[in-house]
Amino acid sequence: EATRLKENVFYQRAYADYRGRFYLPSFSYAGSDLNRAIVEFADGVPMTQEGWDYLMLHTANVYGDNADFEEKISTSKSRLSLYLQVSNDPVGSFEIWSKADKPFCFLRACCEVRNIIRTCKNGDKFEFERFVSHLPCELDQSNSAYQHISLIMNDEELGKLSNLQGEYSDLYKTVADKLHCPAEKWEKRKIVKNVAVPWGYGASDVTIIRQLREWKNNENKAQYLRSLNWEELSELVTEVRRVIESIAPTVAKFRKEVSVVIGKRLGKGASELIWQTPMMFEVHQRFMKIKKLKAKVFSGHDIVELRAERPINEVEKRKHRSATAPNIVHSFDAAVVHSLLWNASYSGGTGNTQVSRTPLSFPVVTIHDAFSAHAPNLPELRSKLLKVIGGLYTHFDPFNNWLMLVGGEQQSRQISSDWIEKSKNAFS
């Protein structure tokens, strides 16, 4: 069946949740590592010298490198013999590529490198235009939740930690270096990432522990975690969270500021929060208490228990307080995607912003804070992303707008985008 369907063009539906975040079906580029490795663009683009550099960046990323943008490209170019070894003998080199951060994507990238070399190498030169690439190559937003919070709160120090400006910063390594757990350095950093990412978006300790329990089943990537029970995992998550809070106190400050506003709003009888993102997506946040229903019925063979949940007319205030700050970040995160796909450009100042659009000239796959395009199109994509996130905050001040819409006390933060557009590691 796979052979029959090979190279057939297909389209995938996407839907937006109530915050504006896009989701694709389970079998899609947004799916597993294997899914992502086998889905390609239907139309190809001729390779370029700059596109080759971005393919090197993509290959380094899926291999698992964590370094400065230019350093990753340079290191990746020094590994060409390894990439050829993997692509020429995937079975014999299984021990190499199976330990990559994204094994199947790494294998696919190695095959792309091999095919380009075979097609384009002419003596000591490369004639890149001879190769037509269909491979989606990815740019990830570095520490996206922390970037948004740094912009919301106008905190340049958090901006530096999350790679919005200055030299390369590895937030996860910075936290990992302060932990006392005896895990290997690479695993310690991975543990921190698996805590910091969901925590940045507002996940509870219990949710994070459950996710860690799933991840620790990976024998190659969680050797230390596999030795921990629930209580020990809980202690580890608490330690990681406290270190993050100590070096990024603005995150807790932002959540507290939002919680105070929500408390006042709920105290006045509100049952729903409504706000618009800069791209005019209207968020409706409504949390009601749930009545759980159970009933036992005969299925024809056995007695089975049916369970259902029905909302009742009582506001779930605790959920509003805990979920609003993360949902603000999620909605602003979604606005970056909407603005990019709309290819928006802005003029005017805060409160008097004009938005115009032109058709995007190349295909893009978006998965929340990850953006994929043909390698030759990544330089333009990267430039657009930096302008988008800079423009959203300097032309709109979306958090101030949120405060106005929900009845909070507005604060002018005078956010400058100069340092954002100069960043080379915000998307890499």
Predicted regions and their residues:
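Conserved catalytic core of nucleotide polymerization and phosphodiester-bond processing enzymes
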Residues: 1-428
